[in-house]
Amino acid sequence: MKYAAHSRTYSTNNYYFCPIIYKSTNYCTMTQDELFKVLVAHCKEYGFIFPSSEIYDGLAAVYDYGQMGVELKNNIKQYWWNAMTRLNGNIVGIDSCIFMHPRIWEASGHVSAFNDPLIDNKDSKKRYRADVLIEDYLGKIEEKINKEVAKGRKKFGDSFDEEQFRATNPNVLREKAKYDEVHSRYVAAEKANDLAEYKQIILDCNIVCPISGTCNWTDVRQFNLMFSTSMGSTSEGANTIYLRPETAQGIFVNYLNVQKTGRMKIPFGIAQIGKAFRNEIVARQFIFRMREFEQMEMQFFIKPGTELDWFAKWKENRMKWHVNLGMGAENYRFHDHEKLAHYANAATDIEFQFPFGFKELEGIHSRTDFDLSNHQKFSGKKIQYFDPETNESYTPYVIETSIGVDRMVLAVLSHSYKEEQLENGETRVVLSIPAPIAPVKAAVLPLVKKDGLPELAHEILSELEFDFNCQYDEKDSIGKRYRRQDAIGTPYCITVDHDSLNDRCVTLRDRDSMTQERVPIDSLRSIIDSKVNLNNLLRNLK
């Protein structure tokens, strides 16, 4: 294979090029559980995510972001922030405090209603969310049905009629009847908040503890998820306050300040990125469910009566934002809520196909005027909006979009992690992170640590580092350095060789295809920018 540039020919037989070309894109065979464990280990090994307080044996469900993880996280946040505030002239930002007046959480309903139904297995001493146990059971039934459908499709080929198959196949009908019965009981129990029925469903379905394998369950109990602490100089004079369980309330209590000082007219939105805290009794699946996490929320204030139209628009808008990353539209789906939260009249989740199944990535809710009306009631302050066009005052309705930053990080990492079988039998580990949000955009690699190559490499680095997060690496063979960059998701590697001193050209290697081309040093910035600039993603959203 040859690469031509400026009348010169560079052969892949030259030792400084990566000598391994794809035989095929075959991923190593692993179960989803095995893949997830490998991913967690990879995140630690390459500086993405560490267990918090590890030298003290860690703290359950609390994680720290390393040097690669914080770059990825910041890039995701920038993508969201710019999509919200730059592409929408009627959406502005805010940064509210974690500590707020405790009455805020009474008004929002969190003090009385922010609970999870939990159940313990007496043999393993492990605690679980009862609703999640039932939902996972229903998910397994769905998997059985889908497997039967897949078998039918394989058997009948092009003549396969899925609708007819689902309506007539005895195995599908049997599983569907089982699903419908359990699902209807579950929905009724949710609406009635019937904790005894939760347990009865678990017993009737013979749902066992994953650890002990037994059905020896306690009764289901409700646990409030808010962390409380004290504010004051002495314990006697201290007031109980809460670490915020969501960022939304900081927007609601400030919405009128923003509206007046920004001369905002309805419809308008307020965006915020910030930490939230929930005392998750059952925290698991790595950074998917943590006790300290980060949210990206936007509250969109609208005229009452228009909420369902705006709800539909924001559903479409948010799904487009996700799919725009290029991680496959088939990996996303909407899941409408059957049991609505106390503040909502419509709600849906955007779910992503994680290694452990489709799970919530973002929530979109029509919150009506619940929050603003309650804050007006509890504070005694009028916080209505005066509409100059209709000359009337009213309490706006709100459409909320809420996404977990940590879940987005996990979605990107779990989708991007690949182990590829190469022609020489070796396995290449690569993170095919979308280039605009990759932690490192380019690595500058001198072929050897002498003959003036490091000096030229540093010259290139000093020009690129103003525009991109770059790395310099001169240790080990060029092949090993390529592998290190593949493992952290660097889209481009720039190899500086002896010919570079004369022709001022370098070898640019693409992460995903491993193809290489000879390019002038003066063209590097524009070539890389065309692939990794975040604005490329944003333009697709217009």
Which residues does each predicted region cover?
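N-terminal amphipathic/basic-hydrophobic helices that include classical n-h-c signal peptides
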Residues: 1-29
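NTP/phosphate- and nucleic-acid-binding module
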Residues: 16-17, 27-542
